[in-house]
Amino acid sequence: MITIALFLVLLYFHDQLGYSAAQLQFGFYSETCPSAESIVRDVVQQAVTNDPGKAAVLLRLQFHDCFVEGCDGSILIKHGGNDDERFAAGNAGVAGFDVIDEAKSELERFCPGVVSCADIVALAARDAIAEAKGPFYEVPTGRRDGLIANVDHAKNLPDVQDSINTLKSKFREKGLSDQDLVLLSAGAHTIGTTACFFVIPRLDAQDPTINPEFFQILRSKCPQGGDVNVRIPLDWDSQFVFDNQIFQNIKNGRGVILSDSVLYQDNNMKKIIDSYLETNQSSKANFAADFTKAMIKMGAIGVKIGAEGEIRRLCSATN
C-alpha cells in the first residue's frame, strides 16, 4: 500500500478546491465519533477479503454518487419504485450498497445520528482502494446526506459509448480536468470488471482502436447472442491490484471498453497516459499521488454542508 503524505494532500485541497468544499474537514468526526473511520475501514476490509471484486465496486459507487446531485449519498436512496437515481440506465451494475448499509449499522450502534452516508461512501472508496494495494489518503469529511434521488437527474452520467469530446464536456461540467478524466475513468479501471453488455456493441465490426488479437479474445468472452451479464476484467492483467498496467493496455489497443480506448486517440489525453506508462517507481508513485488528488477533488463535487440536507438514520431512506 502506498501512503501519500498528508501535507501534500492538504496543500492541494486548500489551493485547488472551492469554498463549499473547503468546509469539509480532515478528522471531522474526531470528537463526535472518534472511531468512525476505523469502523468503516473494518467493514470494508472484511468485505474485500470475502470478495476482492468489492474494491472496484465501492470505488465505482462513489464516482456514480458524486456525478449526480453531488457527493450526497443520493444513489443509496431506495423509495421502492423505479424512479430512484440508482435505477438510472447509467447506474446499471452499480453495487456495494450492502457494504455501506453494514458500515452505517455499525456506526449507528456507536454514534447514532452522527456520520453521514455520503461520508461513508467516500471513506469506503478510499479504504477499498487501499485494500487493492493502492494509495491510502486522508479523506476530508463533513458531507451531509441529500434529500433528492431522481432517475431523471442521472441522465447525463459519463457513458462507455461517449465520444472523447462528450467525456471531456461531462467532466468539465463537474469542474474536473482532462487529467482528472484520465485518472477517474481509465485510471480507476485498474481494478474491477465490466459486463459484456458494455463490450458487445464494440464487436459488431472491427473497432480500429482494438488490437486485432485482443479483438478475438473479447469476441470469445462476449460473443454476439451470448450472456450479456458475463463479467470480464477491465484491466486484463491485474484486475484486483491497483497499478498503472491499465495505461499500457490502453496504449497497446487492449482497452476493454470504448470510453477507455478513445482516450488514447486524443493528443492531450495521450500525453497524460504516456506520463504514467513508465515502469519505474517514480511513475507509479506519480499515478498514485495524482489519483489521490483527483479522488479528493471529485469527492468535493456539490457537497452539502452545515444545515443542508440531513444525517440519515438509514442510508437507503431519507428521514
Swiss-Prot record:
**What are the alphabetically sorted keywords of the record?**
Calcium, Disulfide bond, Glycoprotein, Heme, Hydrogen peroxide, Iron, Metal-binding, Oxidoreductase, Peroxidase, Secreted, Signal
Q: What is its EC number?
A: 1.11.1.7
Residues involved in substrate binding: 158
Q: Which reaction does it catalyse?
A: 2 a phenolic donor + H2O2 = 2 a phenolic radical donor + 2 H2O
Q: Which GO terms describe its biological process?
A: hydrogen peroxide catabolic process; response to oxidative stress
Q: Identify the residues that bind Ca(2+) 2.
A: 190, 235, 238, 243
Q: Name one GO cellular component term.
A: extracellular region
Q: A single Pfam family, by name? A: peroxidase
Q: Which InterPro entries match?
A: Haem_peroxidase, Haem_peroxidase_sf, Peroxidase_pln, Peroxidases_AS, Secretory_peroxidase
What are the annotated disulfide bridges? 33-111, 66-71, 117-315, 196-222
Site feature location: Transition state stabilizer: 60
Where is heme b bound in this sequence? 189
UniProt GO molecular function: heme binding; lactoperoxidase activity; metal ion binding
Q: List cofactor names only.
A: heme b; Ca(2+)
**What does the record give as the active site?**
64 (proton acceptor)
Where does this protein hold Ca(2+) 1?
A: 65, 68, 70, 72, 74
Where does the UniProt annotation locate this protein? Secreted
The positions flagged as glycosylation sites are 280
Annotated signal sequence range: 1-22
Cofactor annotation comment: Binds 1 heme b (iron(II)-protoporphyrin IX) group per subunit.
Family to which this protein belongs? Belongs to the peroxidase family. Classical plant (class III) peroxidase subfamily.
Q: Any other comment in the entry? A: There are 73 peroxidase genes in A.thaliana.
User: What is this protein's function?
Assistant: Removal of H(2)O(2), oxidation of toxic reductants, biosynthesis and degradation of lignin, suberization, auxin catabolism, response to environmental stresses such as wounding, pathogen attack and oxidative stress. These functions might be dependent on each isozyme/isoform in each plant tissue.
Protein name as catalogued: Peroxidase 13
Give the source species. Answer: Arabidopsis thaliana (Mouse-ear cress)
- What gene name is listed for this protein? PER13
